[in-house]
Amino acid sequence: GFVYWHYWFGNGKRLLERPFNEVLASEQPNFPFALAWANETWSGSFHGLKEGNVLIEQTYPGDDDYIAHFNTVLPAFKDHRYITCEEKPVFFVYRPFELPDTKHFIELWRSLAIKNGLSDIYFVAIIGSLHTDDRANEMYNRAKNLGFDGVNVVNAYDAPITDLKYRLIRKVFFKNLKCIPDIRPYRADMFDSCLDGRMDVIPTVMPNWDHTPRTGKRGILLYGSTPVK
């Protein structure tokens, strides 16, 4: 299936919703899909901005907004193409710990789902920055305690940190070249996690990675992945 990023910044503020709306309305392509709520403020270099600059702020106005948000995605949940787990529509949350009341949000949406003829919702927390096994287990347990059914492990932004040899080479030979992005060879173990064997964990497979179109010289680029790796 295909997971579409879904933007809801609070008070009904949305962006980039047209492509998915057309998929929903046209019933094409006839291909399984799910939604992932990219609930974060657009700011800093990760979003192609100077540090400290904010383009769009993510807000959480409260229950009325949560209900409006649910009603907006309900037609997608009821679409026959929508990906389900245990007969529940799967919904990803990009920043699961940034909601001021994550557990309440999940409980509210579960009740709304049942009231609207769904069996429930299968909530998946997207987690990263898992530099150690202890950190990975801490984040996993935190997500589960908030009510998430599953966890998606994404270490894409942490991957270069693990390559000590490459960091040393860059520091010694390229310390004055601040005008080039962070270019490093791909290694499969960059994305391994001690959580990957759990039944409620969705590992991430990433065929290369290039964030430079958005972040330019401050971006990260991984190259050289193959099906074998």
How would you describe each model-predicted region?
Residues G1-K229:
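Glycan-processing catalytic domains of CAZymes
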